[in-house]
């Protein structure tokens, strides 16, 4: 009972809530991949050797679902945080959750991925990259919030269709979010 006020305060923190909800949103991919790691690993425990093509296929499914969970969590955490912030925003001020997800993915890629000969390193796309996914999500949503509140956007005439107008409104927040991630990447590498 003594700790209830402390835990209530933690439960109301929108950043921790976004991390929780972001993980829960990504849970289907995590559970799906778990089936394939079990199918690939359990036979080996009993001395059963799966054919190479079957084993490769099982590990491929696992690697392309659980192996990109950091990328998924970057997007889902950003969306959940943006939705939470939208509930606290002034009227007529809304953060575009789809654009925030895309910017968070780009920011995550900049923070977590390194170039290697002929491609990119996938080492931090999975669970090893979760810190980068949270950093990317938090930066992105806060940059969007700043730009939306301060009206740092490109305004289009009313005759322009809503989707096109929204795309132009998101140019500056997207750009600033990605640039901040670039600066962090440059400073940390």
Set out the residue ranges of the language-model regions.
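Signature of multi-pass transmembrane helix bundles
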Residues: 1-30, 46-189
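Hydrophobic alpha-helical transmembrane segments of multi-pass membrane transport/permease proteins
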Residues: 31-35, 39
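Glycine/proline-enriched, intrinsically flexible loops and inter-domain linkers
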Residues: 41-45
């Amino acid at each position: 009972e003594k700790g209830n006020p402390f835990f209530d305060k933690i439960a109301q923190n929108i950043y921790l809530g976004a991390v929780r909800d972001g993980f829960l949103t990504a849970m289907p991919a995590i559970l799906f991949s778990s089936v394939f790691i079990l199918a690939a690993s359990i036979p080996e425990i009993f001395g059963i050797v799966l054919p190479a093509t079957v084993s490769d296929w099982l590990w491929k499914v696992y690697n392309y679902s659980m192996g990109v969970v950091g990328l998924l969590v970057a997007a889902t955490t950003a969306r959940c945080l943006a939705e939470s912030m939208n509930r606290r925003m002034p009227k007529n001020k809304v953060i575009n959750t789809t654009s925030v997800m895309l910017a968070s993915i780009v920011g995550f890629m900049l923070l977590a991925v390194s170039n290697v000969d002929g491609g990119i390193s996938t080492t931090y796309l999975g669970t090893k990259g979760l810190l980068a996914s949270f950093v990317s999500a938090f930066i992105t949503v806060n940059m969007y919030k700043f730009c939306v509140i301060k009206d740092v956007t490109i305004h289009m005439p009313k005759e322009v269709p809503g989707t096109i107008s929204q795309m132009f409104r998101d140019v500056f927040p997207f750009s600033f979010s990605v640039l901040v991630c670039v600066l962090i990447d440059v400073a940390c590498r």
